[in-house]
Every structure is written in structure tokens, then in C-alpha cells.
A protein has these predicted regions:
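Terminal amphipathic alpha-helical/low-complexity segments used for targeting or macromolecular assembly
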Residues: 1-8, 13-14, 19-20, 56, ...
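Structural signal for interior beta-strand "rungs" in well-ordered beta-sheet cores
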Residues: 3-189
Length: 278
């Protein structure tokens, strides 16, 4: 089915628009843009040069996709934003393209970006992540699959967040947050394994215990991170999730967060139960 493009939208004839899209009035789409099938672009959205968008995406009022990077190193490079399928990009979200020639900001599939979220240049995001209201992700970050950011989280540049992690509202962090955990506070700290979300992701009880044991060695032991990793290899049964933890810890360049007090950890655990239902 042919796409429906409002005559009040400003869509470049050079832009490539897929089938069965709906583009509302006052949308602005530049020349070097590709949009897949079955996308809905609501009024007052701007989609800028270098944007490559898959199918089934919804972009809401006031969002800017493919904005020039807010980086002093940007000198007009031919860079991109690459977006997968079935993402929801809500009102006033900004996604910057890469800084250097060929650079890419990447958003995978089935992600939900709430109002006012900002994804900066060259950040790579996996699938099924949630970004709460006003969350700000700085440049060159790497974010795994199934990560939940609560409201107004600020992630500093070149940090990483592992799969199925959850981050408390209002948290600002500049160190890596490993997979399968709850984290939050100021400064950000470890609050325990993210058991509710792991269970929702069909990770069995035995594996969840292995994850908990691995992080007990990392966050409750009296050894260095290097020694804790070796203890995980020696003491925790192997499996995909444990290997994911080991690889994440071994490749951390910014360092990882530390342990949180029990009272705050209890609050974050209750938040995790809430998000597992959405």
C-alpha cells in the first residue's frame, strides 16, 4: 500500500519512504533519509540527513532524529543514525548522528524512548530497552539488550550498561554497569541481581543463582576485580550468562560500580518488580 504523506509535510523528493507509512502535517524530512515500511511520523518531527530507519517505527511530536552531533570534533562528516524496527520514539526525543565520517549512532529493535530522552553521537543500543522521561545518554556509550532506565538518568560518555540491567531514577553515572543487576543512587552503586527482570526474560532459577554468586564475589568479596573474575571462573558453573558477566568485567575500561547499602537496594528491587509487568 502506498504511503500517505500530508501535503503540509516538507518531505524531500530525494528521501526514500517505504510502503504503508503515514507522515503527518509539518513533518520535515531531509534528502539523505531512508524510512522503511509501516512507519508513522507524527506532526512536527524532523528527520535529518544520515538517518536510516527500519520498519514499524513510530516517531512522535517534536522528536529530532539524525540531529547534528553536539561534539566539538564534528566537522561536517558524512555520518549516520541507524534505527531498527518497531521502535517507539516519543515526544521531544533527540537522537544525534555520528561524529566522524562513517560514524553511526545505532538503535536496535523494539526499544521505547520516553518523552525528552536524548541519545548522543556514536552510542550503540541493543534491543528491547526502555529509556525513561528525560534520560540523557552521552556520546560513545554501549548499551545491551533489555536495559531499563528510569526517569532522568544521566549516563556519561564512553560508559557501558550490560544486558537486563535496571537503573534507578535520577542516577548519574560514569562507570560501567554490568549485566543482570539493579543499580542506582548518588554516587551509583550495585543494589543486587535483577531477579525479577531475569525471570521475565525466561532465565531459570538455577542460572539466576549463578549470577547472584558471581556478583557476590565481585561486590561482597575483599579482593580486586581481577581476582574476583578468576574466582568466578573457578567457582561458578559456566553458562551463557556467566560468560557474559566475565566478558563484560574483563573488557571494562571505565571501571565498574560499587556496592549499595541494603535499604536503598530494597527500594530498587520493588521498582524492578513494577517494570517487569510493563
Amino acid at each position: 500500500m502506498a504511503s500517505i504523506i500530508s501535503p503540509k509535510a516538507e518531505v524531500s523528493p530525494k528521501a526514500k519512504i517505504g510502503d504503508n507509512c503515514k507522515i503527518y502535517p509539518f513533518v520535515y524530512i531531509e534528502d539523505d533519509v531512508e524510512i522503511g515500511d509501516n512507519c508513522v511520523i507524527y506532526p512536527f518531527v524532523s528527520i535529518m540527513n544520515g538517518t536510516r530507519m527500519g520498519s514499524g517505527n513510530k516517531v512522535f511530536q517534536g522528536a529530532v532524529v539524525g540531529a547534528l552531533p553536539q561534539d566539538f570534533n564534528f566537522k561536517g562528516a558524512n555520518s549516520f543514525v541507524v534505527i531498527g524496527d518497531n521502535n517507539t520514539i516519543r515526544e521531544n526525543v533527540v537522537i544525534n548522528r555520528g561524529t566522524y565520517d562513517g560514524g553511526k549512532t545505532v538503535l536496535g529493535n523494539n526499544n521505547f524512548l520516553m518523552e525528552g530522552a536524548h541519545i548522543s553521537h556514536d552510542t550503540v543500543i541493543g534491543n528491547r530497552c526502555v529509556f525513561g522521561y528525560g534520560t540523557k545518554i552521552a556520546g560513545d556509550c554501549v548499551i545491551g539488550n533489555g536495559v531499563i532506565y528510569s526517569t532522568s538518568v544521566v549516563e556519561n560518555a564512553k560508559t557501558r550498561v550490560g544486558d537486563l540491567a535496571m537503573i534507578q531514577a535520577g542516577t548519574t553515572f560514569s562507570k560501567d554497569i554490568p549485566p543482570y543487576i539493579i543499580a542506582g543512587g548518588k554516587p551509583v552503586k550495585y543494589a543486587g541481581p535483577n531477579n525479577i527482570i531475569m525471570e521475565a526474560a525466561n532465565i531459570g532459577e538455577k542460572v539466576r543463582k549463578h549470577v547472584a554468586n558471581a556478583y557476590r564475589l565481585v561486590f561482597h568479596g575483599q579482593t580486586s576485580l581481577f581476582d574476583a573474575i578468576n574466582q568466578i571462573k573457578d567457582q561458578v558453573p559456566d553458562g551463557a550468562e556467566v560468560q557474559n558477566i566475565i566478558h563484560f568485567l574483563e573488557t571494562s575500561e571505565k571501571g565498574v560500580i560499587t556496592k549499595m547499602k541494603d535499604a536503598v537496594a530494597s527500594i530498587l528491587s520493588r521498582q524492578s518488580k513494577f517494570f517487569s509487568k510493563i
